[in-house]
Design a protein with these regions (language model features):
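Radical SAM enzyme [4Fe-4S]-AdoMet core and its adjacent flexible, acidic
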Residues: 12, 30-35, 70, 79-82, ...
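Short, hydrophobic secondary-structure boundary micro-motifs
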Residues: 56, 148-149, 177, 281-282, ...
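Phosphate/oxyanion-binding loops and surfaces in catalytic or ligand/nucleic-acid-binding neighborhoods
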Residues: 50, 167, 171, 292
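Membrane-interface junctions of multi-pass transporters
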Residues: 254-300
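Short cysteine clusters
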Residues: 17, 21-24, 233, 251, ...
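Processing junctions and N-termini across compartments
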Residues: 11, 15-18, 227, 280-283
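Short, solvent-exposed beta-strand edge segments and adjacent coil->beta transition regions
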Residues: 6-8, 148, 286
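Conserved alpha-helical substructure of the radical SAM core
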Residues: 1-106, 117, 121, 125, ...
């Protein structure tokens, strides 16, 4: 039996990455790996529209580095669930851009700053000019897929944020997002945090889209998730992380993959959710997490109002984008 609510799913094609970002807990990933084709097929079979409203190809690695990238993208085209992808943009050449067009709804590129020194620090090991050229190409070539930007919420990125936003808008990119929390990965990262209240002010000030609502299908389903789960952690309960190994993880903050709930080869999503609903907090992950207890009753009410407002704003932006492309 399917659960009474739908979730978002993060699928990790690879836990290997071509970047060396300071906010990435890569030292915790003991066995970086590539997802095998049979595992990918098993995952696709588990993704049912009545249980999943959105799938994001993301994780701790860079999806465009997978040697089966083109084959894996092809498998998305006829699937009934919505797929999006997150990338750092470094390998996003014209061939990949054209192949992604229409296979995913939204491509989200992580971009830290127009300032070369800041970019070099935050997105270490990547070529800023190459990424910027790839963004221009994607904005020009995409006909069916939308291009969005995830702006990095680190203190180093804020001084040049207005200039970064101006450059992105000058390229015609209108979907600019930011998370109101730089997740500290279960307490493992403490050196790059900004207060959530400050980040929300920045998001509002620059008219950005808050990423805290990207994994929420509806306010009613969040309430049903809250009621069904023993551990009242909204960020955990709205999302499911499927690692490159095919393991369902307790939480996306489990970078070390120490808390698997089951494997896609033997366990469906509905059964996995029933298991997770009965699980308590994991002290090793939860005690130091800056997302824990984030959404208590008062915060949920505020978030619900903001969620409704964000949906109206998103609908308005989408109409403008559609009109712009049609004219």
């Amino acid at each position: 039996m399917s659960p009474s609510y739908r979730i978002a799913v993060n699928v990790e094609w690879t836990s290997k990455c071509n970047a060396l970002c300071p906010m990435c807990p890569r030292d915790q990933i003991a066995n970086p790996q590539l997802m095998r084709p049979e595992t990918w097929q098993q995952i696709l079979a588990r993704l049912l529209p009545e249980e999943v409203f959105r799938v994001v190809i993301a994780g701790y690695g860079e999806a465009t580095t997978h040697p089966r990238f083109f084959d894996y993208v092809d498998a998305l085209r006829q699937h009934p669930v919505r797929f999006d992808m997150v990338s750092n943009g470094h390998l996003l050449d014209e061939e990949k851009i054209r192949h992604l067009d229409g296979a995913i709804d939204l491509l989200i590129v992580s971009f830290s700053s127009i300032d070369p020194d800041v970019y070099r620090y935050v997105h270490a090991n990547l070529d800023q000019q190459r990424v910027m050229a790839n963004l221009q190409a994607a904005q020009k070539l995409f006909k069916h897929t939308q291009l969005g930007i995830s702006l990095t919420p680190m203190p180093e990125c804020l001084p040049a944020l207005p200039q970064t936003i101006d450059w992105l808008k000058a390229q015609g990119i209108r979907t600019l997002t930011m998370s109101p929390t730089l997740y500290n990965r279960g307490g493992s990262l403490q050196d790059h945090e900004l207060a959530t209240a400050r980040l929300r002010q920045i998001i509002q000030q620059y008219g950005l889209r808050s990423q805290e609502f990207d994994f929420v299908p509806s306010a009613g389903e969040v309430f049903r998730q809250w009621r069904a789960n023993r551990f009242k952690c909204v960020p955990r309960n709205v999302d499911l992380f499927v690692a490159a190994s095919g393991d369902y993880l307790y939480c996306y903050n489990d970078a070390a993959h120490q808390h698997p709930i089951g494997h896609v080869s033997t366990l469906g999503i509905s059964e996995m959710l029933r298991r997770r609903e009965q699980m308590a907090a994991q002290p090793g992950l939860c005690d130091g997490c800056n997302m824990r207890d984030r959404y208590r009753a008062g915060e949920l009410v505020k978030a619900g109002i903001a969620f409704a407002r964000s949906r109206l704003q998103a609908a308005s932006r989408n109409r403008l984008i559609f009109i712009g492309k049609s004219s």
